[in-house]
């Protein structure tokens, strides 16, 4: 493993010889020990992701599995940005799918691979009227998807047609086996015209809306009383007071005039 420091233990000398300068110690060769260390260093251990890193890797793997590539013919006026906006992907995804080093490599191709989700609307073959008129089949699925469509399409149509034919035969059998005589029709009419038993409806006594502190008076009665007390009574009192005062004043003036000096 990288970054590992070799650990050498104490090794005894193989031979000791005396020299003029001192003692000469000879040790055995370290070739075997170095090869052992290299073998130990060559061992690799698999590190398993845990926690958020594990979920991140699993989600990224699922995303890669869900992506399929469709091929599209490049028309005049197409750019990487327009295709990315049209198919809801990024320019980086288009560059990665087509191995573009820069955006100028796009103009050297006639077809482009577009990454889309496996079960999306974009994987269905649909063409615009303009594209049909200029270049039919501008949007194509991969050969594997085309073969699967060819294998599944006609068989599904045949099964649907056979199912409808069986339904028609069952309807014809039911119509033929049904008795359309007058007697059976009369029985049906009599059965429908019979009086069915209806459960007796329980009458719930209605609550008196005028029961309470209003002396069982309706709102219109209360309004009439308020109008009479608040408007009509003061009006009669005012008119009576004015007429009475005028009569008293005229009577006083007449008496003064009669009793005055002659």
Swiss-Prot record:
Q: Which InterPro entries match?
A: LYSM1-4 (IPR045030), LysM_dom (IPR018392), LysM_dom_sf (IPR036779)
Which key words tag this protein in UniProt? Answer: Cell membrane, Golgi apparatus, Membrane, Transmembrane, Transmembrane helix
Provide the Gene Ontology terms for cellular component: Golgi apparatus; plasma membrane
Localization annotation = Cell membrane; Golgi apparatus
Q: What range(s) does the LysM domain occupy?
A: 70-114
Provide Cytoplasmic-side residue ranges.
Answer: 240-262
Q: Which positions make up the signal peptide?
A: none
Q: Does DNA repair count among this protein's keywords?
A: no
User: What does this gene product do?
Assistant: Essential for Golgi structural integrity.
Mind telling me what this protein is named? Answer: LysM and putative peptidoglycan-binding domain-containing protein 3
Q: Which gene encodes it?
A: lysmd3
